[in-house]
């Protein structure tokens, strides 16, 4: 991959408005042209963004699959994005960066899907520069079709917490800091001005849990007060997870320590997810990652 163009996608979810603002602000403030790497910008789901909703028919960030239904707006939109900006598209891009916000207290983080060498290289570069935690989402058959998987290399930049359809200048500034320096960091790496770290620290997806529900499928317990806003912090056996209306607590029962992410993400209620569990892993950064990224 001779890296020439990076696709920056905002508004993949229409009610995540801070990334769109950040890109508009970037284009006004940062007019320096990089001769080596060009940014291409696109709003992923413009109709949902216009209406202020997450999606029209289906989640766009689950729509990059082989299943084709032209009656679904997001399927058509996914096809358009790949046909225009995909590796074999009319305006091909080598890398896709998908910008998202979350109502969960995730801070500024990276989401990876699978273990592609190119993705590891880019994630290592960003973690080394900004100290970002990485959520490696893999082996979840219930959740597939993510946007960045349609490109040879791609990551999600996830920032929170912020409410849906609410502008937060602090969140916007975090996007600006990373996007404004990304090309410089890639160029420095290519020119041997900086080196990748020896290790990459990731939180590997283990599964997700739903809210407790009654026999009719209604939620009958909420996330425990001690668990709210505690993303990335370890949960050990007997730690509280949920509390019902009578004040009874449901605890974590397993022996293995886990680290939760996306605790109480509002958009995930419809997916029956109250939080996801991860385990820590150290990935050795190899020369192969670097070589594949720039090949």
UniProtKB/Swiss-Prot annotation:
It catalyses: an N-acyl-L-aspartate + H2O = a carboxylate + L-aspartate. Belongs to the AspA/AstE family. Aspartoacylase subfamily. Zn(2+) binds at residues 13, 16, 100. It comes from Prochlorococcus marinus subsp. pastoris (strain CCMP1986 / NIES-2087 / MED4). NCBIfam families: PRK02259.1. Keywords: Hydrolase, Metal-binding, Zinc. It is an enzyme of class 3 (hydrolase). Its cofactor is Zn(2+). It comes from the Bacteria. Its EC number is 3.5.1.15. Substrate binds at residues 54, 61-62, 158, 268. The lineage of its organism: Bacteria, Bacillati, Cyanobacteriota, Cyanophyceae, Synechococcales. Binds 1 zinc ion per subunit. This is Probable aspartoacylase. Disulfide bonds: none annotated. One of its GO terms (cellular component) is cytosol. GO terms for molecular function: aspartoacylase activity; hydrolase activity, acting on ester bonds; zinc ion binding.
């Amino acid at each position: 991959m001779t890296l020439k163009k990076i696709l920056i996608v905002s508004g993949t979810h229409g009610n995540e408005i801070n990334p769109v603002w950040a890109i508009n602000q970037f284009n006004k403030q940062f007019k320096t042209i990089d001769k080596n790497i060009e940014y291409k910008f696109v709003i992923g789901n413009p109709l949902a963004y216009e209406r202020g909703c997450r999606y029209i028919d289906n989640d766009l960030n689950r729509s990059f699959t082989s299943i084709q239904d032209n009656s679904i707006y997001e399927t058509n939109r996914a096809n358009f994005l790949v046909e225009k900006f995909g590796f074999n598209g009319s305006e091909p891009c080598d890398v896709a960066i998908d910008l998202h916000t979350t109502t969960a207290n995730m801070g500024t983080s990276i989401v990876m899907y699978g273990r592609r060498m190119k993705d590891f290289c880019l994630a290592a570069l960003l973690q080394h520069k900004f100290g970002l935690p990485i959520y490696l989402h893999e082996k979840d058959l219930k959740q597939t079709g993510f946007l960045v998987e349609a490109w040879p290399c791609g990551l999600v930049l996830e920032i929170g917490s912020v409410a849906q359809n609410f502008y937060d200048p602090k969140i916007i500034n975090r996007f600006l800091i990373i996007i404004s320096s990304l090309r410089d960091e890639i160029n420095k790496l290519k020119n041997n001005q900086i080196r990748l770290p020896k290790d990459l620290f990731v939180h590997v997806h283990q599964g997700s849990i739903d809210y407790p529900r009654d026999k009719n499928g209604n939620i009958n317990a909420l996330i425990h007060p001690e668990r709210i806003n505690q993303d990335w912090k370890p949960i050990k056996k007997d730690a509280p997870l949920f509390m019902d209306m009578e004040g009874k607590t449901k605890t974590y029962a397993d022996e293995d320590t886990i680290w939760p992410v996306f605790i109480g993400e509002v958009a995930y209620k419809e997916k029956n997810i109250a939080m996801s569990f991860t385990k820590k892993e150290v990935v050795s950064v190899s020369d192969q990652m670097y070589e594949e990224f720039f090949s």
